Amino acid sequence: MRAFVLTGPGEFAVRDVPEPVAVPGEVVVDVERVGVCGTDLEFFTGDMAYLHQGHACYPMRLGHEWAGRVRAVGAGVDPGWVGRRVMGDTMLGCGSCRRCRRGQQHVCEKREEVGIRGGRAGALAERLAVPAGSLHALPDSVDPELGALVEPGGNALRAARATGAGPGDRVLVLGPGTIGLLVALFVRAAGAEVHLMGATEDSLAFARSLGFPHAWREDTLPDLPFDAVVDATNAVHLPALAQESVEPGGRLVYIGLAAEPSLIDTRALVLKDVTAVGILSASPGLDATIKAYAEKAVDPRPLVAATVALDAIGAVLAGERPAGAGPGPKIHVDPRLM
């Protein structure tokens, strides 16, 4: 089968690789759609921390935001999965440690991460092998495009819920990229007023096109009381800005990761009586995200700018915009395209 293989920083090829096998406890999926993520870009540039911590190494196969149809099942797996449309959890815990037993496999010390950590091959390929226990069934109303948006959506839904926001609340989301916009969509669906802060006029214009009129640059951000602030950026200085912007008694949600340590004055957290929350992984939010998409409470499809073939991934990771791409921040891949 064909797969996108990253062999080093900026070095890649689409290769014929051995077909995955459905070993006991696992399934093989025909991949229909995959999202290209900021994590994939960090592996492409060589900046991803896992490369320097021994959790990942080249060559590797990327892709963790995926949807597809089960092709085959291994021993011990319900054959009823065959033919079903699914997406899968990225985080694969050991299943036996204290964290896994508590349902926190996404922070298991020994976890694998599909297309990211521990050598587990990712979904930028025609087919993918994953544990059956990681599967989440997709209803007919959630098509492949939506299915590949469940994983980032799960992260965003958890961040939105962590704000505790509802009608009458005002929430500031820093960063109108894929995650920030998804957070904004879920917060709006909860009934709160949403403000977004971004760095470029294009990103802010796109946010406004989605029905978010309160879209600002850092130098135009109004002095308003924000009941919660979500930092969905990788900017080192913005965690502190989030802390400054939130109302006393409010909530800070950190879902972005900067390349360098950020500085937060914990005295301000205490004196403002602020609750700060970190969000890692979509795992606990996947089912609720599928439900939200199926019920059309949130429609993230405008975020997808283009869908390309495997052969175009390298150019996308190198920063090229596909011909005819829309204004959204997300690029999808359909491995069936030639």
Regions found by a protein language model. Give the residues of each.
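Glycine-rich beta-strand-centered segment in the early N-terminal region that forms part
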Residues: P20-V34, A49-R98, P139-S141
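Short glycine-/small-residue-rich Rossmann-like dinucleotide-binding loops
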Residues: G35, G74, M91, T233-N234, ...
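NAD(P)H dinucleotide-binding glycine-rich loop of Rossmann-like/cofactor-binding domains
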Residues: H64, C94-L174
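C-terminal hydrophobic helical "lid"/dimerization subdomain
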Residues: M1, A240, S283-M338
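Glycine-rich cofactor phosphate-binding loops and adjacent beta1-alpha1 units
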Residues: T163, R170, H195, E201, ...
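Short strand-turn motif at the edge of the Rossmann-like AdoMet-binding core
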Residues: I255-A259, I279-A282, V308
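Mid-domain Rossmann-like dinucleotide-binding core that forms the NAD(H)/NADP(H) cofactor-binding site
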Residues: W81, V142-E218
